[in-house]
């Protein structure tokens, strides 16, 4: 048998000589591959252990153990590399130190952990929009001497800025901090040169401490040490004194904000050297003097807001050199003169507000044709004269316009219909004519939501249905005010078509007739003022079916858009500064004082649970004060004075805990004045003219006046008294019956016992 046969007999197959080296090579390569895999695995473990610096890791774990969040807790897993934890960034060094912590909007609360100070390589720390509290620790920058960005805004930090004493390593090199944002906290005290972030900082580019309670003078020394500063924000604090000279050293400054403080004096001249300035925000202070002509040097200025100060003088004639201006707000000052013609060169203006100054001139002569981007125009409360400025129709982007409280004459131009985006129009307190023509034109403004035209059209007749033929006019009107004009006629029925109406003011006119019940059908109406008219008849029950006043849910369904201009619903409110920037800020109320209404107050009034104000004074209302008024749990003001109301003041009104004003002067009320709750705070004068009232805050005792004829008491109170009498009699009768039964049973058994 051959060798090949022997191999086959044993079950083997002979391989060729060429296959044996290949198999050996394959086994060798597999071995090498396994060694590589093992090496990579060991290397990855070693690298993994080396990625996270152990000291930094312990500091972070200490950090997470000292802050909490019920909304978004820190789920840092101690078993994995800390460089992979959420919000953590490490450098590429062999030790892999922590260089950044970014955990905004996590609802973290607790003290700012001191363990952060051990992260000596930290360059960025962002813990903004949380609930951290406590003081900033002393030595903050000395420990974190690599920190470049610090954002602790929107927290609850308090106390003063600590004084920085020494550097961590004893060297004299400066801190590299570049961005500091401590806004929206509760920090206080003065910002001194030795304060943290001030001593040894030479690279600051942004410093924001707005919305705190800092006091003293606005610091300017950082402009000397950090000339690269581009943003300074000191607004919404309690800084006092003058704006210091020295801010002009910040030649790179693009944003300077110090509004809403108590600073005074003039704007320093070196401010006008800031050629890079884009925003100058100094409103709501006590600044005086005039706006210097040198302000035209700030050619990069986009926003100039100096409103609510005591500035005088005229607007610089060359204001048009500020061609990049987008917002010019100089309202509520004492600025005089005319609007410079060069203002037309500010073609990028989006918002122009010069309200409440002493400006004059003819508005119709102003060139509005170049303001193609203008969205908000407010020239109210000045002394502008002439016809309605028809050229304003060139401002195609205009959405809000106010010329109220000026001396405008003539009629509203049909060109206003070209302002397709117009949503707010305030023309109150002028000398405009032809209300029928005005409303006929304005009903075509499809986007108009607020129309204030009161104190115009004196002694004209309110247009009737036949005068306004459009069936779909004012489709989006929410606020309509035409009070103070002495308008004649009746409340027009065409108003019922305004289904979006939420606020209506027809006060201070000469309207006659009755109050239509359909006023109660508006789904969103929550504010009605019909005061000081000649309206007669009774209060319609349907008026108290207003859905928006019957439930909080329906009231909340009313659109709550932010108004682009503050609204003075009644033109008389301008002097008392009762302005509203949001529709729902108006107190839900019904004002019908000083009319000729008679009859009783409908009990349906108790359905208006959202009502805050009810004024029915100076009418001829009679009957009782309905106890259903106690269901108005949101009521703050109730004025029923100067009517013919009788009976008692319902004791149930003491449950109205929000009621801060109550007046029933000059009625025919009797009985005791309720005590307790808010009734202990109302002055005695609010009850005068009711000789039969007693008790409470009055000196008159109720001993001689508690027994009053039933006709002078409230029906509800009488029913309560009758019910009490019935219960008393029933109780006495029951007692006699039980006693008799007991007596009979006892003596019956006694007789039986004796007989035995």
From Swiss-Prot:
What name does the UniProt record give this protein?
Answer: Receptor-like protein 3
Region entry N-cap, spans: 51-88
Repeat LRR: residue ranges?
95-119, 120-143, 145-169, 174-199, 201-225, 226-250, 252-274, 275-298, 299-322, 323-346, 348-370, 371-395, 397-419, 420-443, 445-471, 474-498, 499-521, 522-546, 548-569, 570-593, 608-631, 632-656, 658-681
Glycan-modified residues: 66, 126, 169, 208, 262, 273, 334, 345, 381, 434, 447, 459, 573, 666
The organism named in the record is Arabidopsis thaliana (Mouse-ear cress)
Please give the knockout or disruption phenotype noted for this protein. Answer: Normal resistance to F.oxysporum (f.) matthioli in cv. Columbia. The double mutant rfo1 rfo2 is strongly susceptible to F.oxysporum.
Chief localization:
membrane
Task: Name the tissues where it is expressed.
Answer: Expressed at very low levels in the shoot apex.
Entry keyword Metal-binding: no
- Where in or outside the cell? Cell membrane
Q: Which SUPFAM superfamilies match?
A: L domain-like
For the biological process aspect of GO, one term held by this record is:
innate immune response
Q: Which residues cross the membrane?
A: 726-746
Give a Gene Ontology cellular component term annotated to this protein: plasma membrane
Pfam families from the UniProt entry: LRR_1, LRR_8, LRRNT_2
